[in-house]
Structures are given as C-alpha cells and as structure tokens.
Amino acid sequence: MFCSRFSVTLQLDKLYSFMGFFGLFSKEKKETLDKGLQKTKESVFGKLARAVAGKSKVDDEVLDNLEEVLITSDVGVETTLKIIERIEQRVAQDKYMNTSELNEILRSEISALLIENNTDDVDDFEAPLKSKPYVIMVVGVNGVGKTTTIGKIAYQFKKAGKKVYLGAADTFRAAAIEQLQIWGDRVGVPVIKQQMGSDPASVAFDTLSSAVSNDADVVIIDTAGRLHNKIGLMNELTKIKNVMKKVVPDAPQEVLLVLDGSTGQNAFEQAKQFTKATEVTSMAVTKLDGTAKGGVVIGISDQFKIPVKYIGLGEGMEDLQVFRRNEFVDSLFGEAK
C-alpha cells in the first residue's frame, strides 16, 4: 500500500514538474490555489453536509437546502437557480439519486457553467502576445486591489521576459499615483505619470507613446475607480480609449475589471456598473484567500458572460494566478468528490 501511494505521489510530482516547465500549472500553484480556496470549500461543504444530514435520497427538501447553501456562498440567485434546475432535470431522469452523489453532480454542473464562459486556453504570461504593444486598461473601484493587481501582472510579465510600461491614469487621487510608482519601483518597470488632477487621457497617450518609442511588449493603464457618476465614468473611459487609439489603433486589446471577491454580492453590483460604463473583456477576482465567498467567481462569470482571467490568492507576488477552471473546481471540491 505504501509503495503504491509513494508511486502515485512520485508520478504527480513528475506531472506537476512537467507542466510547470511548459508554463502550465505547477505543484506550487496548485498548493496556493488549494490554500486560497480552503475557507470557501469548508463553508460550502460544511453547509452541504448539514443540508443532507439524515437524508438518503435527493428530494425537494434537499434541493431547497442546496439552493440556500449556494446563495449564502455568494454564487448569486440567478446562477443558483440555474444550477438547481439542471440538477432537478438529472434527478428526474435518474428517478432515484443518493445524497452521496450530490457532490459529484454539483461539481459537474459548476464545471459546465464555467466551461460556458471560460476557456482553459487562457494565455499564461509566457505565451506570445497577440499584438505589440499589448495594451491592458484596468478598471475597478478603489479598494478592490486594483493597483496591487496591476503590479503583480507587471511582475509576472516581466518575469516572463516581457518589457512592461505602466500608466498612472488615475489622476484623481495622489495616493493612486504614488502606489503605482511604488509597484513600478518594486517590479522594476517604468511608470508614466503626471501631476494629480491631470487629464487621464493625456497620461494614457504619453504612456503609449513612450512604450512604442521604447519597443515595449505590454502596457498597463490604471484608471480612476469612481462609481458615483456613471455618465462621467463612461465618458472618461471612452476618452481614454479614443486617445490611446491615436497611438496604437487597436488599443486597448483588453479591458480588465478588478473585483474584490471578499465583498460577495457587492462585487456583482460593481460588475454591473462597470459593464454598463464600458466594454469589459476580462475580470480579475482578488482577495479570495481570506474569504469563504469564493462562489462569487462562479456567479459573476455566469451572469456577465465575461471570462475570469486572474484570481488573487494572497499577498505574495506569485499569488496572482491565471484562472484555470478545471484546477479551480478541483481545488474547490478536493476530497469532497
């Protein structure tokens, strides 16, 4: 038995090493993901175990309890009802279903939802860029970890051998400019900035001009995180986009919305506001390591039909990961299969 387990462990170590060599999912990244989702896993499956206690089959009461578990885990009402409906259809087909099968059914339905809106072919930082410079405009409210996310993305791209420029176009807060400069110094990449109160579009223009002149591979533009005036936000982001196109015609190639996963339903409201203000093409969900609200990743991806590209799992530079749906589900369910 020991030899068998040792052999399996050795083979897994070899597999993770092989995957890590090709920039895929290393053993260390898997361990970070497992640790980051631990609170969510314990919360969801603790509630689920209580919901099915004493039940031998999946009936209406079990499904009602499961619905409550998912909603209180911040999966969201719409997505929860979609999952419950799909499980009901499977129960109707199978006629009799043990509660012991519920974890596996739930796992498969969550996987199916993530497949609909997320590809496992998301480029890692080492992958060739679709254009040069590849311009990412980052949006999100203050306090969600936007600047930290920008810094970590810059670090990962630089580590992968890319030349990175940062643009401090959140000119409404002196602290935002200072924080981005601190990250630029820490990572070792240039930060293009102007004084507080300057025109954000002007900063974006200067950043792209400098990046093109210096043959940069990646440009990341920070923007103001104000939601109190949706029309003003929309106009500002549109102006930044239009000005960037004067330098790089197809910029920005990506509009990344950063959301704080620990805020649960608040993140849904932020996503709603920003998707109305501008075309968001990808999302980063941060601070998942300190919360039991990891279900928000499932709900937001489903409701807004926008892929989650990054997840934040800790304070370390390496703790921002490219989101891979299969590994996410594996870590979420773990031994609860």
Identify the role of each PLM range.
Residues 179, 199-214, 228-334:
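Conserved catalytic-core segment of NTP-binding enzymes
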Residues 9, 13-49:
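N-terminal accessory targeting/assembly segments
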Residues 24-25, 331-337:
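P-loop NTPase catalytic nucleotide-binding module
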Residues 224-226:
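Short glycine-rich anion-binding loops that position phosphate/pyrophosphate groups of nucleotides
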Residues 34, 38-169, 176-196, 204-211, ...:
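Primarily NTPase-proximal linker/entry elements flanking Walker-type ATP/GTP-binding cores
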